């Protein structure tokens, strides 16, 4: 529907409902604040009835006498001569109509009635016959099944108003008017908003059934089983354009369908006992209103758990399209697509002073077939741009990030193009005003249309018969791992593969099992993403493995295949994995390892993601989260021992071969020495650990850097000073070979300068390490008995791990030892040798946040303003718990509010430890006299977190899932 397409807007005022049956919560006594419509009252979605005879059958047929180009997304687009059906003509200038496909507002002056039997259109009760519906299309989109035994009963209108329901006494948001008693017959069979409430069998003798469209009985849909041979399904399917053209259905619609089915099944879902509140249960109107709102909020975030994979992990139903709608005036501005490197820049004076323009941007994940073939491949999502006001004076600029680089030897035959079309499926034509700098494409859009589609492609002018454009470019593929908001004893996760770098925060998944077609799609949240280079379209095997013995991926689903033709077409591939807990009583977050292999069984990429936590347990909650344990509490930590002892792979000390090399085109000698920034000579060669560029401030400016290995040292090298030459090792490459042991030693240099809290480290290790013997061996305590670490016999594995950690702490703090060890470095070295990459990432991020808080101390307010624009009141709130009796925070305790802020800020950034450390470094660089000038070890941690994947892929042989942990 045109009037109900907007899923998310940046407008701070009231937003439109997401679907017609979710209802609009409006208190008429308080008035309605203006949204995106100017002086146009949007009828309640409950008025968009499913009653064909009283709603769509009660429409007045009109013909368009002018073309209408929508100035708003609530306006229906039509051309001269189109037939429309007016549902509400009560407005003087705007009427509400549909065209058998969409609904929206139309200007009354642009249409005229088919006949002039009635000169006035103010009476919306006048009924004309609706045109014939497309029977074949209705049958193709038949997702409802048959409703036997009931037919629709026309609804009587009050005062000729089709939008006023007869039974409105149960609506807590309608003030005024007589409150008639509840219809007792309507209570014989209630349909709750929740799809999975237990439903009683249909009663064929009931005289009236009230279906709840917007959350409570409104009398909008009355159904009487007058004839067992006539079904409502046919009427709804053929006469209701929503049920003929919609791709998904809301919970309220599905509730009606399930309530009227012949053999409804009683649900035993996780939330099966949750019922909608009844008015008679409350003493006052306000109490009922509050309870109804609470129930509605919960109901809209839940699905029938039995029909969605038999587990409580599939309960998120938020909108998933990555889009934004914004209104700009003549001052211009920029519109940024959320969670994507796509933006539109509007110059000043784009529209006349006093005018506004509504701009919509949407990233379409699946590209059209036209843009993916042997000679062409998409390297960005298709961007849909919609403009409302076409009386414009200037052009607009679109900027987006691409995931491709043309090889040097192919730059004469292959190029990066920006193409556009007025239709999603094409045809697409190149845009001449396109500029490429690095991985960003900037294109100037003129000849603007109300709806445009723009995409960036890599195209070869001429290729050999057996080759493709993939052989001439370096293209990156993005993997996103999606799952529920909270994990449960049994849940499903989805690995999605995209042909570009845009992985949305939520992903719509509809095929979650052998379900009925009427089951709505499910929106899953992004847990983590990873990019890797793919040389050609080929079959890819994607494996998912758990690091905890308590969780296991179904053996038959550990490795799924993405076919090469899917990769070539650029379509989004969704791979579903079932993950279950061996012990349902012991549920905690854990780490997933995702491994991608090619058709030759070689590992192309592998990475780790941290799962969310289980849902919070009911109980008293403290107002302030405590992040530090008292000494007395350390021994009282409740542990969850693993079901079995975990086995770990063996660290292999060998040469790292999968490297790219670059030629240095400039000599750099630094006046201010930095052990993490390389010095080099022009003409030498450097080994590159990753093609990913990292933004970092140099001596004066923020630049892009590679992580390089040069003459035995690991560090950053300015990307503009390197000419990438390929994977073949140059003859004149100097310095020792890079081995996994040397690599490990180099990346852990900054660790001994990081601050830590021992109690926190102890707790994390006890919860995540499942084999004390492997932990001790990796620390160098090879073949030592347990009595070497503790006197008493310990029963649980976590306590044994804690005793080994205590021994390490004693050895590192021993002043009599000839070789002084660093506790942090020894610990992280052991964990990386055990392949506990996710655990290392978590510890490093904790160390970095704590160290930054200690180094900043009283200057944390300046950083808070740079990172998150924190107000003075919020800063005072962070310091309040740490003030002494005189109301002042001691200088030695100033690190505590700084740490509280950094932990809160990091949680808002997301689960990517790389992004957190990168953004923190950028924020520190923006400070006056930044601490990174004297404390350079945060730069070293950037090298560490960006090199762990390369170390892992070289140091460990592929192993069976049962023999591997992270």
UniProtKB/Swiss-Prot annotation:
> Subunit comment for this entry?
Homodimer or homooligomer.
Q: Where is the SH3 domain?
A: 57-116, 657-727
Residue ranges of every copy of the ZU5 domain listed in the record: 322-457
Q: Identify the keywords attached in UniProt to this record, alphabetized.
A: Coated pit, Cytoplasmic vesicle, Endocytosis, Membrane, Nucleus, Repeat, SH3 domain
Q: Per its record, how is this protein called by name? A: SH3 domain-binding protein 4
Q: Name one Pfam family in it.
A: DEATH_SH3BP4
Record comment regarding domains: The SH3 domain mediates localization to the clathrin-coated pits and vesicles.
Recorded GO molecular functions are: GDP-dissociation inhibitor activity
SMART domains the record matches: SH3
Its job: Possible role in regulating endocytosis of the transferrin receptor at the plasma membrane. Alternatively, may function as a negative regulator of the amino acid-induced TOR signaling by inhibiting the formation of active Rag GTPase complexes. Preferentially binds inactive Rag GTPase complexes and prevents their interaction with the mTORC1 complex inhibiting its relocalization to lysosomes and its activation. Thereby, may indirectly regulate cell growth, proliferation and autophagy.
Tell me the superkingdom of the source. Eukaryota
Indicate whether Membrane appears among the record's keywords.
yes
Primary gene name:
sh3bp4
Q: State a GO cellular component annotated for this protein.
A: clathrin-coated pit
- InterPro entries reported in the protein's UniProt record: DEATH_SH3BP4, SH3-like_dom_sf, SH3_domain, SH3BP4_C, UPA_SH3BP4, ZU5_dom
